[in-house]
């Protein structure tokens, strides 16, 4: 019996497959955090020329972040196929070949790096490329399959967007950018461990040494609580350093108290539903915190 002929894929469907490789929702948050870094680096409203630089910088960061996401899909296609939340990815479903995905990733990386180098500044390009290497190679290939601390160490790459944004506008990496980096770095572990808690069986089947798999639920929940407490303190630093004023402080305290509350509840009385709510609130926490920084920046 002869094999069935391959199913033709329309151009729009193929484009959607390539777009899905870039993990658009993740990249949107990355670009948003980079944008906050750009805007905070500029006193007052950006000029027309600065808005142009912001646009090019956002485009460059989006392209390189998308390239890293696509490369990640190649490396983790076997793992993605075993996990419900990632089984839809085109590489996991066999809709795109490794060669197609690798070429797509390379094109995005080259295009984004060129935009940043020629239309923003070389420092931003090199920092963005280092972030690509940190995520795609050091985190995805080395840390993630090796250690349950993968999220902690690899979180440095995920915390880079505001640093990239700051460098894009100032051609330097100031202490303000490092404060923003620290906030995201400390936010990352409780965010991902909350997800891993209610997806623990999927991670166990995938073979990834996530903390709930290697150290159990109780230990992971304690770590979530501890990190939310440390994060609460870190989120006060923009006010202490003079980057922001009282409106931001009020937002930071409320959001931090909410995240700590979820962490405490999760530690005391676990349920998958509560872990899912904690994960979702973590997204609200980071987005609202950076939005508060932005609004505070323009208050008289």
Curated annotation (Swiss-Prot):
It catalyses: heme b + (2E,6E)-farnesyl diphosphate + H2O = Fe(II)-heme o + diphosphate. Gene3D superfamilies: UbiA prenyltransferase. It comes from the Bacteria. One of its GO terms (cellular component) is plasma membrane. The chain crosses the membrane at residues 26-46, 54-74, 102-122, 123-143, 150-170, 177-197, 224-244, 246-266, 279-299. It is found in: Cell inner membrane. Its EC number is 2.5.1.141. GO terms for molecular function: protoheme IX farnesyltransferase activity. It is a multi-pass membrane protein. This is Protoheme IX farnesyltransferase.
């Amino acid at each position: 019996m002869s094999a069935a002929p391959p199913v033709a894929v329309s151009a729009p469907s193929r484009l959607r497959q390539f777009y899905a490789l870039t993990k658009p929702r993740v990249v949107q948050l990355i670009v948003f955090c980079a944008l906050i870094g750009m805007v905070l680096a500029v006193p007052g409203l950006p000029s027309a020329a600065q808005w142009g630089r912001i646009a090019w910088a956002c485009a460059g960061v989006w392209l390189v972040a998308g390239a890293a996401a696509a490369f990640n899909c190649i490396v983790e296609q076997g793992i993605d196929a075993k996990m419900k939340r990632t089984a839809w990815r085109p590489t996991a479903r066999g809709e795109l070949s490794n060669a197609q995905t690798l070429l797509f990733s390379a094109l995005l990386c080259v295009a984004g790096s060129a935009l940043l180098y020629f239309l923003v500044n070389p420092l931003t390009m090199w920092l963005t490329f280092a972030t690509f290497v940190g995520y795609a190679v050091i985190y995805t290939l080395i840390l993630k399959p090796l250690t349950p601390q993968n999220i902690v160490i690899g979180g440095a790459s995920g915390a880079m967007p505001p640093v990239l944004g700051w460098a894009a506008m100032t051609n330097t990496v100031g202490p303000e950018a490092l404060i923003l980096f620290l906030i995201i770095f400390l936010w990352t572990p409780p965010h991902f461990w909350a997800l891993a808690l209610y997806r623990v069986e999927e991670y166990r089947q995938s073979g990834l040494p996530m903390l709930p798999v290697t150290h159990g639920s109780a230990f992971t929940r304690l770590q979530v609580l501890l990190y939310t407490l440390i994060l609460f303190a870190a989120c006060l630093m923009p006010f202490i350093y003079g980057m922001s004023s009282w409106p931001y402080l009020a937002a930071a305290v409320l959001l931090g108290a909410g995240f700590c509350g979820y962490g405490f509840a999760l530690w005391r009385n676990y349920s998958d539903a509560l872990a899912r709510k904690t994960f979702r609130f973590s997204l609200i926490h980071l987005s609202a915190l950076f939005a508060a920084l932005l609004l505070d920046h323009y208050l008289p």
